[in-house]
């Protein structure tokens, strides 16, 4: 099938590449001509495990193409995916200008029936808005479909190729048949393609992300209570996770959620509720807890150093909002770095993938280490902010010899408490006993 993907950000590139992998002819379009040229030459502009191989293979086999010309991209496409940014506006609502602008441009170019699919995360009612914009600019027949993505950064290729479900919002029979055909190779093991109306589909995406964010904030609250009552959050997590009604996933406490989805989507859903005169109290609490949780580790650091961080040097392991990605959008590490710098501290950081993005954002306000151990040199303490696998089993002998003080503030609960006792560390984690 011939497909066009408008937008070559994270969602657009994963979508386009994975659709090409099953034999579709895919043209991805982006207004950034320099980026398009780079991709035409086989250079992948994002880091995502497993994507580079598929990306390069489908370019070589001439199933994946890139252009900056919208007319060229959609000319023969039967389905057009909109994978465009919907950044939060000043009031927290999603900015639909990119989506609606693309819809208008596409409408003016239509010559035959096509299916327009919103892959971006959009508020309820967006499909209706896209339809109105397009009808004002064309008399050619078309269908607008909601098909939200449920990709997890770090495992996005697997999520697309073997989805646990595909949600499609459409009441158009032709569009339904086309989407069922398109996704059939990805659901051969029986995972469902769930068809529904457009508004339910749009809300499903926001509801899913907001529920997961709620689980995270709830467990962070439990972790904070554990520290006060002398309980261990890891034991509590195991105890409640064994209940199949709750499940084991998204029960890890830490320093708050980040990334391109959860913060934006929770805020947008709360704003959508507000616009419909509904006070979504739980989501307000979820956001409040998350902001507070980002400050927890710095407060612990300040208490240890008696409130004076001026002239102190801190090593930081982890900058990305989660492991296996270079994405730093709303990363807790950025908030923690800002607080430490404002307190007069110096920082040496290491992250396997995200240092370039951080340097592009904040420049030389901090130093960037060649490896995790270089970051420890002359450091008064180590802060662990992202649970990269490389940080889970470090060379403790090298740590002992390199750190100025054997002091660790662990925002991801990576290490066994008994081991840290045996090594003679001051070890302050989240929701567990303080080792001092």
What do the PLM-derived regions correspond to, one by one?
Residues 1-436:
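Structural/interface elements that position substrates and couple domains in central-metabolism enzymes
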């Amino acid at each position: 099938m011939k497909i066009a993907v408008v937008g070559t950000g994270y969602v657009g590139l994963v979508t386009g590449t994975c659709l090409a992998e099953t034999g579709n002819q895919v043209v991805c379009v982006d207004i950034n001509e320099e980026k398009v040229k780079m991709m035409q030459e086989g250079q992948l502009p994002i880091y995502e495990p497993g994507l580079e191989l598929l990306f390069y293979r489908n370019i070589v086999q001439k199933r994946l193409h890139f252009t900056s010309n919208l007319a060229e991209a959609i000319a023969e496409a039967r389905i057009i995916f909109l994978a465009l940014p919907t950044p939060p506006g000043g009031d927290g609502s999603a900015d639909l200008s990119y989506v609606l602008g693309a819809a208008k441009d596409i409408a003016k170019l239509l010559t035959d029936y096509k299916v327009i699919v919103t892959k971006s995360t959009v508020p309820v009612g967006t499909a209706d808005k896209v339809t109105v914009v397009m009808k004002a600019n064309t008399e050619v027949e078309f269908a607008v479909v909601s098909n939200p993505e449920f990709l997890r950064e770090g495992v996005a290729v697997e999520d697309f190729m073997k989805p646990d479900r595909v949600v499609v919002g459409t009441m158009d029979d032709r569009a339904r048949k086309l989407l069922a055909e398109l996704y059939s190779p990805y659901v051969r093991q029986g995972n469902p393609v769930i068809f529904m109306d457009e508004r339910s589909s749009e809300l499903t995406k926001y509801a899913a992300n907001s529920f997961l964010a709620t689980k995270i904030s709830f467990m962070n609250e439990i972790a904070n209570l554990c520290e006060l009552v002398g309980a261990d959050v890891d034991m509590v997590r195991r105890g409640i996770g064994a209940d199949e009604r709750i499940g084991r996933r998204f029960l890890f406490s830490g320093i708050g959620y980040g990334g391109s989805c959860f913060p934006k989507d929770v805020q947008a859903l709360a704003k959508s509720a507000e616009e419909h005169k509904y006070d979504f109290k739980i989501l307000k609490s979820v956001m409040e807890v998350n902001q507070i949780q980002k400050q927890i580790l710095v407060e612990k650091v300040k208490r240890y150093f008696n409130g004076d961080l001026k002239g102190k040097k801190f090593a930081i392991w982890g900058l990305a909002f989660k492991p296996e990605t270079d994405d730093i959008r709303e990363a807790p590490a950025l908030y923690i770095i800002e607080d430490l710098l404002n307190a007069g501290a110096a920082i040496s950081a290491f992250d396997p993938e995200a240092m370039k993005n951080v340097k592009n954002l904040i420049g030389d306000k901090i130093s960037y280490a060649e490896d995790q151990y270089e970051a420890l040199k002359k450091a008064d303490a180590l802060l662990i902010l992202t649970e990269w696998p490389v940080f889970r089993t470090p060379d403790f002998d090298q740590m002992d010899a390199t750190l100025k003080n054997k002091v660790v503030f662990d925002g991801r609960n990576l290490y066994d408490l008994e081991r840290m006792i045996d090594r003679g560390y001051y070890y302050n984690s989240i929701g567990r006993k303080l080792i001092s």
